[in-house]
Amino acid sequence: MFAQLDTKSVYSFMDSVVDLNTYVKRAKELGYQSIGLMDRDNLYAAYHFAQLAIRNGLRPLIGTEANLFYEGRKIPFRLLAKNNQGYKNLMKLATELSSGQREFTYFSDYLNDIALILPSEDWEPGMSLGSEVFIGVRPEDAGKEFDYPVVPLHTVRYFENADRSTIQTLHAISQNVSLSEVSICPMNQLLFSAKEMEEAYSKLPEALNNLNQLVSDVSYQFDTNLKLPRFNREMTAVD
């Protein structure tokens, strides 16, 4: 069964129109059993999302997108917490991100119980990233060879392609530029059905198998000790 990992919510500042209630409701209608949330550089929606998913009979997959510098290149790594300790490590990582830390090597001690996913377009041969590492692939990556196991990585930022204009407007506002200066928002970053996604990745069966194994290893036990990272009110907004 396909699991949607890389979904951005409205908590990804000016970069998504996905609200949690609609996301969970639609995911259930579209045949998902496991769904993820990977907001950019924060976990502010994580606990609420997880509780909402559980109440609707879905397995929550908690992660984040962290833009880190690896050998001078800025890479949007995806990080997935596999258990409570992984979730706590993600919270520590998010706190460091809010303080301005961006060097990949700095976070080596934070990656225990976390699956690291590198988008295929950012992969280069010989990259040394750690032990539990995957390459996030698109359907068009079929036939390519990578140094690490592959998993499907489909980004969701909106529910309809018509919402792309809203995303572009948000980007223009956040960048303080005119709409004509903003890069065109990619097509089809929407929530397809689980069946449609399995069909899209039919030429990458190893990616689907790896995804199923990865998701089956994810488990959280939520209690009052699992709290959210606080906003750093002294930090100014950065890209």
Model regions and ranges:
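Active-site-adjacent beta->alpha loops and helix N-cap segments on the catalytic face
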Residues: 16-20, 41-52, 139-145
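Helix C-cap/helix->beta junction micro-motif
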Residues: 56, 146-148
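N-terminal beta1-alpha1-beta2 module of alpha/beta enzyme domains
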Residues: 13
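Conserved active-site carboxylates
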Residues: 1-10, 19, 23-34, 67-136, ...
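Active-site glycine-centered loops adjacent to acidic/histidine catalytic or metal-binding residues
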Residues: 39, 155
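Generic beta-sheet signal
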Residues: 63, 136-138, 153
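Glycine-rich loop at the start of a catalytic domain that most often binds anionic cofactors/ligands
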Residues: 43-58, 164-168
